[in-house]
Regions:
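Residue(s) in the substrate-gating loop at a strand-loop-helix junction
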Residues: 121
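Canonical Rossmann dinucleotide-binding motif of NAD(H)/NADP(H)-dependent dehydrogenases/reductases
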Residues: 1-11
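Active-site loop immediately N-terminal to the catalytic Tyr-X3-Lys motif
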Residues: 76, 124-133
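Active-site helix of classical SDR
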Residues: 98, 137
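The beta1-alpha1 cofactor-binding region of Rossmann-like NAD(H)/NADP(H)-dependent oxidoreductases
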Residues: 36-49, 80
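SDR active-site lid
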Residues: 154-173
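Substrate-binding pocket helix/loop in short-chain dehydrogenase/reductase
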Residues: 74-75, 79-84
Length: 173
């Protein structure tokens, strides 16, 4: 909400279209909800077209990747589908969003290139018992981010990893 308070146009991804109106009402006209699942390349591509149209030649200042899930339990009880869902959401989903939105982050139409912020967690650097799926996906996200950071140096696009410690959010419900 700080970006909105400073007058920036904020695009926020949501999976449930029914949340569009309440979020728009809560955050105001500078909040544009985008309905897509980060694991669905086609949905993200449609959102990209909407953002590109709204920006009308301007660049996207920041891409924040924050999609996540946390299904906890011992490895012997986690299904391969649950493990796969962690990787698809946090790693492949981030890859999808970066790849699709990257053209809007370049400095072609603006004096300064955009930034990519990938939200990790303490689980991205330290494995925890009963969190193998979550920690594995966060480790992979950090590896992807480090590689991307070096790859995008030539374009002066900064890649930032933020790894907050645990705090109460809906992911733990």
């Amino acid at each position: 909400s700080e970006f909105l308070e400073r007058g920036f146009l904020v695009f926020g991804s949501i999976r449930d279209k029914k949340m569009s109106a309440p979020l728009r009402k809560k955050y105001g006209k500078n909040f544009i909800p985008l309905v897509f699942d980060v694991t669905n390349y086609v949905q993200i591509s449609k959102a990209y077209k909407k953002v590109k149209s709204i920006l009308n030649g301007a660049n996207l200042g920041i891409l924040i990747n924050n999609a996540g899930i946390a299904q906890l339990g011992p490895v012997e009880h986690i299904s391969s589908q649950e493990f796969d869902l962690h990787l698809k959401t946090m790693v492949v989903g981030t890859f999808n969003c970066v790849q699709i939105f990257l053209p809007l982050l370049s400095a072609k139409n603006r004096f300064s290139p955009g930034k990519i912020i990938n939200i990790s967690s303490g689980g991205g650097s330290i494995g925890q018992p009963f969190m193998a799926s979550y920690c594995s996906s966060k480790h992979a996200l950090e590896g992807f981010s480090e590689s991307l950071r070096r790859e995008l140096l030539i374009h002066d696009i900064k890649v930032i990893i933020i790894a907050p410690r645990a705090f109460k959010t809906a992911i733990w419900d």
